[in-house]
Amino acid sequence: MAAEALAAEAVASRLARQEEDIRWLWAEVHRLRDEQLNAPDRCQAEGPCLTREVAQLRAENRELRHCLYRLRLCLAEELSHQARLESAARAEAGRAAAGAQPPPSQSLEEDVKKEIDPDNEVKNPPNFMKERLKFFEILKKDHQLLLAIYEKKGDSSNVITVRVADGRTVKGEAWKTTPYQVAAEISQELAETTVVAKVNGELWDLDRPLEGDATVELLTFEDEEARAVYWHSSAHVLGEALELHYGGLLCCSPPGDGSFHYDVYLEDRAVSSAELPVLESMCQAIIKEQQPFERLEVSTKVLLDLFKYNKFKCRILKEKVATPTTTVYRCGPLVELCKGPHVRHTGTIKVIKIFKNSLAYWADNPEMEMLQRVYGVSFPDEQRMAAWEELQEEARARDHRTIGKEQELFFFHDLSPGSCFFLPRGACIYNTLIDFIREQHHQRNFTEVLSPNMYSCKLWEASGHWQHYSENMFTFDIDKDTFALKPMNCPGHCLMFAHRPRSWREMPIRLADFGVLHRNEPSGALSGLTCVRRFQQDDAHIFCTVGQLEEEIKGCLQFLQSVYSTFGFSFQLNLSTRPENFLGKIELWDEAEKQLQNSLMEFGKPWKINPGEGAFYGPKIDLEIKDALGRYHQCATIQLDFQLPIRFNLTYVSKDGDDKKNPVIIHQAILGSVERMIAILSENYGGKWPFWLSPRQVMVIPVGPTCEKYALQWLEKRKRQIML
């Protein structure tokens, strides 16, 4: 222990000296910048050198701090163990002298338990929680030391101007003034109802200090972004309860639409629906404690040490975090890898309900670990919770599976999971939708084509789908070659374009295909008509020149507006940009995204950006429709693709005679999956189909036995008229 203490002292001393060097160097940088106007040539040479030296020192200091963390942690463990031994020895000596019976032993784990849960509901907190909390406290102290350096007390440049969204300005102090303090200066009521801030366009914790002059927006629960933060913080409350109750490994808690969930890995057991009330009670206790959310930015290397007990967090750090540092949040005993932001404390969450559990897979891959998923919802008042419960009751009554059974539209069977059996009335709705969308395509000069259902894997390798999508494809071997059922039509349509030379005079070429598609969805994800393995889609592809792009995308947007106004849906548009696993050059992606943005601006409807949510071959415009219950469903998509024409070497002869010109492909699906659209329509209409879609438009009722013959004759006559 003595050696470790000496080592820690040496590291701390070196760290202090280097922090002082950093302060001096920064002072020099600021001095040079002030002199820049008077002597730009001299300062230009000195400035970069000093800033590089600062960067090198900071990088070395990060390593020193990490070493110091571990040394301090070892010392704390050793001292704590020694103190427990000495305390136990003194207590034993005292009892021996007094002749008293020894009281029940109490371990450090029980002290942690008391801090976590005053009611002592948790009998055995996970062992990793104690070490994690100690580690976090060391990180926090180091962060406070670093923050003190940035505060630069007494420096007049520390004064900042904060502009609030309503136009008023407030004076503050850099690295001290928080958005919550700004809100409280306006009114305490505003401060208490604000969920999260937006600082210079970036979501920001209310208690996170401002770093300079800023424009601050104060968002309440009425704002969509604030609701997402509110539910994300609620998920952390659920995560704390899951960790305490099960001792499992927390995985992830992505923001949901109107609710939240948390995935947890339990090696030898499962979550039971009977345990949900217990989890809800634990969440309520956590909320009552008003545990503050604390944010720290920490190096990835240190976080790998902090989360060494959790293989899932380590995977995220190694595979998803590309930056040298990232953030963690603490509330109570929970320390979680998270980008944030969060509400101020758990007491901000007034009402919570844990209502469902299910199974999931890590990364949605059935080959990976099976996880337990628990769902919850929360609100700032009882009235909103009551409205939500009423909406859920209405949603259960409108469930398309219930309507399908009651109206004899369709059913599923275990002998063909994920493939729907449409009964006569359901087939009537299905075919009416297909006929409707087919006619809409014909009116817009699309040419209908038919393409094969299965292809050699060589096609999918050429398109890139084999590398990115093969786990979702049904494959089989024929004559020593691997084939797959098609999950989409675009590669087949590329073969159609390439089967003969093409000229600019033919462009744009618009192909529409209504064939059957198959996707190997995980069995746990199958859910009625909303997620199936066999489906039909109005899958269209437009091959056009770069100069035709803007007009064609405009036509696609007008197409989807026409169709969804027929159904009576309102919608919102999302531009999904380059994902991490993208194909091709960044320059092409930037050009494609710019084209889509221009088209959306000209279309004139509200839209927003979904960063990183594009397809691997190109950016896309997704449409989300709003149903009668206020829920959003993603349906139509317009995707721009510069990659497939290059991968398939698709060319046409341009107007100036260049026969090596690559076309651009626009992927268009207006309804998307017909099966999924039937599910959405049945729930939106509550089973009360509009006349043109209804499978029972007319019913002939004879008033008596003498009229039956005439009624049958009339019915046959109408059938013949419909067929003609």
Curated annotation (Swiss-Prot):
Cysteines paired by S-S bonds: none
Residues forming coiled coils: 44-72
Molecular function, one GO term: threonine-tRNA ligase activity
InterPro entries, per the entry: aa-tRNA-synt_IIb (IPR002314), aa-tRNA-synth_II (IPR006195), aa-tRNA-synth_II/BPL/LPL (IPR045864), Anticodon-bd_dom_sf (IPR036621), Beta-grasp_dom_sf (IPR012675), TGS (IPR004095), TGS-like (IPR012676), Thr-tRNA-ligase_IIa (IPR002320)
Modified residues (Phosphoserine): S451
Membrane spanning residue stretches: none
Residues in TGS domain copies: 155-220
Main localization (coarse): cytoplasm
PROSITE patterns associated with the record: AA_TRNA_LIGASE_II (PS50862), TGS (PS51880)
Alphabetized NCBIfam families for the sequence: thrS
Similarity comment: family membership: Belongs to the class-II aminoacyl-tRNA synthetase family.
The protein, known as: Threonine--tRNA ligase 2, cytoplasmic
Phylogenetic lineage: Eukaryota, Metazoa, Chordata, Craniata, Vertebrata
